[in-house]
From Swiss-Prot:
The chain crosses the membrane at residues 4-24, 33-53, 154-174, 195-215. Binds 1 zinc ion per subunit. Zn(2+) binds at H139, H143, E220. The active site is at E140. GO terms for cellular component: plasma membrane. One of its GO terms (biological process) is proteolysis. The keyword Repeat does not apply. HAMAP family: Pept_M48_protease_HtpX (MF_00188). The gene is htpX. It comes from the Bacteria. This is Protease HtpX. Its main location: membrane.
Length: 287
């Protein structure tokens, strides 16, 4: 309920601020409501469609093999560990899968707490100790228990709405300015206007990515804390330390990467979906 209230309040705030700014700039606000509805439909529509098909998409893009019947003791232990942690966290047992990759990584995805998937790479499953893997699994189960998939989808929907709305409002201001200084009053013209909107979509999109990445980093710290409760602080730290010593992870689709245990490094930390492993380890030790 709080999450939905925050969502509505944020969108109302966007509309209010935009209306005030448009009034100050002398822009006709009679169509602002329609534009916001348009932006929200496409902004949230894309985010929620992505969430709804997240499990299916993960299985297809990552080549995940869901474990229905364990083939060996390692797979049996993996399923039993996830089942135990899910019970501790009070959620329905997620599907458990393995995807073939030499990297040390894992991720959680799914539209809800009771309809989720936890997947680990073959490199992680056969390259880390059971204590380290237990820490990784606890982190992913915590993502599911915390409702992070839905939370970040709502945040993504808000920023998508902002990007679509703001880009077209600013393009409208530019068009009106050009029109007022044009003897024929024609403005930018359709193709030039579309070009301006495209550039603004890109610029605002970068800002939006930074906002989503910021909230993603916060959720990573929370998932680490939850992982420490489910497995133990020592196992969680051991898992992160092992990841820190390993090679940088390879490419993973953005939606899965946001809930992976190990994110890609970036020159600018503000663009990273995961905090640096050193900071995560330090936060756990200080807790």
């Amino acid at each position: 309920m709080k999450r939905i209230f925050l969502l509505i309040a944020t969108n109302m705030a966007i509309l209010l601020v935009a209306s005030i700014v448009m009034s100050i700039l002398g822009v006709n606000t009679s169509t602002m409501g329609g534009l916001l509805v348009f932006a929200a439909i496409f902004g949230f529509g894309g985010a929620f469609i992505s969430l709804a098909i997240s499990k299916w998409m993960a299985k297809k893009t990552m080549g995940c093999e869901v474990i229905t019947t364990p083939r060996d003791n390692t797979e049996r232990w993996l399923v039993e560990t996830v089942a135990r942690q899910a019970e501790q966290a009070g959620i329905k047992m997620p599907e458990v899968a393995i995807y073939q990759s030499p990297e040390l990584n894992a991720f959680a995805t799914g539209p809800s707490k009771d309809n989720s998937l936890v997947a680990v790479s073959s490199g992680l499953l056969y390259g880390m100790s059971q204590d380290e893997i237990e820490g990784v699994l606890a982190h992913e189960v915590s993502h599911v228990a915390n409702g992070d998939m839905v939370t970040l989808t709502l945040i993504q929907g808000v920023v998508n709405t902002f990007v679509i709305f703001a880009a077209r409002v600013v393009a409208g201001i530019i068009n009106n300015f050009v029109s007022s200084n044009d003897e024929e009053g024609e403005g930018l013209g359709m193709f030039a206007y579309m070009g301006v909107v495209f550039v603004l979509d890109m610029l605002f999109g970068i800002l939006a990515s930074m906002i989503v990445a910021y909230f993603s980093r916060i959720r990573e710290f929370k998932a680490d804390e939850g992982g420490a409760r489910l497995a133990s602080k020592e196992k969680m730290i051991a898992a992160l330390d092992r990841l820190r010593q390993g090679p940088e992870t390879g490419a993973m689709p953005a939606q899965m990467a946001a809930f992976g245990i190990n994110g890609k490094k970036s020159m600018a930390e503000m663009m990273m979906s995961h905090p640096p492993l050193e900071k995560r380890i330090a936060a756990l030790r200080a807790s």
